[in-house]
């Protein structure tokens, strides 16, 4: 059975605004930001146009920014929390930005590796992709068990890159998205994916 999947990145937080590595830090959305609220409204209209404004099953990463975004986009809909869809663990780089890390040799080594080295005291990309794909399978298997043809997940930029790069056998950074953007596609299991399209406000 084909499954229509929507993956969306959460809305903007203070850490995003300051270009910080925000993984396990549990930040709220910037709800007083008029531009963010305008984008949420525009994204809701886009989802209606795509016919995915009321997905049959709604999954979320457990952190506040994802749960708040899901409530704004799909008000009142039950949220199924998938712990394995948490953002990457940035380890020692957590909550810091480029300016604060630029003098750190470990950060320069990570940059030079194209992000392939593990974050000091954090995750490496391979482990993160493996964990995230376990979360993706958890979602799709639950949907098929419950005969759902359409699911949405409000997750992280890293989660989207991990899932799409794995399914498409493509470059990890090819699927970077800003806040409140993501991808929709049809999934048939066993890595079969089609009709991939980018979704943004």
Question: Locations of the language-model features?
Answer:
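Short active-site segment of divalent metal-dependent hydrolases/proteases
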Residues: 13, 159-160
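Generic beta-sheet signal
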Residues: 5-6, 56, 147-157
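Domain-level recognition of soluble alpha/beta enzyme cores
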Residues: 171-195
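Phosphate-handling substructures
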Residues: 73-131
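Glycine-rich phosphate-binding loop signature in dinucleotide/nucleotide-binding domains
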Residues: 47-54, 139-150
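Short, solvent-exposed aromatic-acidic interface loops
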Residues: 196-201
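Short beta-strand scaffold positions
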Residues: 60-61, 130, 154-155
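Active-site-proximal alpha-helix that buttresses catalytic centers in soluble enzyme cores
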Residues: 2-3, 8-77
């Amino acid at each position: 059975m084909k499954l229509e999947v929507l993956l969306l990145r959460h809305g903007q937080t203070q850490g995003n605004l300051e270009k910080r590595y925000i993984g396990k830090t549990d930040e709220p959305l910037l709800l007083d930001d008029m531009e963010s609220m305008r984008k949420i409204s525009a994204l809701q209209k886009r989802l209606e146009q795509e016919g995915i404004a009321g997905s049959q099953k709604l999954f979320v990463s457990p952190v506040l920014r994802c749960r708040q975004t899901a409530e704004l986009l799909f008000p009142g809909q039950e949220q199924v929390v998938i712990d394995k869809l948490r953002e990457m663990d940035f380890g020692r780089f957590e909550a810091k930005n480029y300016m604060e890390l630029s003098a750190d040799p470990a950060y320069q080594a990570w940059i030079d590796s194209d992000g392939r080295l593990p974050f000091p005291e954090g995750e490496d990309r391979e482990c993160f992709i493996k964990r995230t794909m376990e979360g993706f399978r958890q979602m799709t298997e639950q949907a098929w068990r419950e005969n759902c043809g359409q699911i949405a997940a409000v997750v992280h930029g890293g989660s989207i890159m991990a899932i799409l790069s794995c399914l498409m056998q493509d470059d990890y950074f090819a699927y970077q998205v800003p806040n409140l953007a993501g991808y929709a596609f049809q999934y048939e299991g066993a890595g079969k994916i089609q009709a991939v399209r980018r979704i943004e406000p």
